[in-house]
Amino acid sequence: ATGSPVAECVEYFQSWRYTDVHNGCADAVSVTVEYTHGQWAPCRVIEPGGWATFAGYGTDGNYVTGLHTCDPATPS
């Protein structure tokens, strides 16, 4: 289950191999990535100014459609 959209200070940059997420906020954020094909993505805590790497869109065009808040303590 995904939460609400993340704040505008959290951005993602996608390529075919990796999706890098940057936290430009003043506080740590818990983020997961939503994909076109509904692929599962982990919940990662990103410290202020920090980065996290998720899967890219690959050869089948499984693009990132958005970032959402999540609870890192909840097993999926």
From Swiss-Prot:
<keyword id="KW-0022">Alpha-amylase inhibitor</keyword>
<feature type="disulfide bond">
    <location>
        <begin position="43"/>
        <end position="70"/>
    </location>
</feature>
<protein>
    <recommendedName>
        <fullName>Alpha-amylase inhibitor Z-2685</fullName>
    </recommendedName>
</protein>
<comment type="function">
    <text>Inhibits mammalian alpha-amylases specifically but has no action on plant and microbial alpha-amylases.</text>
</comment>
<feature type="disulfide bond">
    <location>
        <begin position="9"/>
        <end position="25"/>
    </location>
</feature>
<keyword id="KW-1015">Disulfide bond</keyword>
<dbReference type="Pfam" id="PF01356">
    <property type="entry name" value="A_amylase_inhib"/>
</dbReference>
<dbReference type="InterPro" id="IPR036379">
    <property type="entry name" value="A-amylase_inhib_sf"/>
</dbReference>
<dbReference type="InterPro" id="IPR000833">
    <property type="entry name" value="A-amylase_inhib"/>
</dbReference>
<dbReference type="GO" id="GO:0015066">
    <property type="term" value="F:alpha-amylase inhibitor activity"/>
</dbReference>
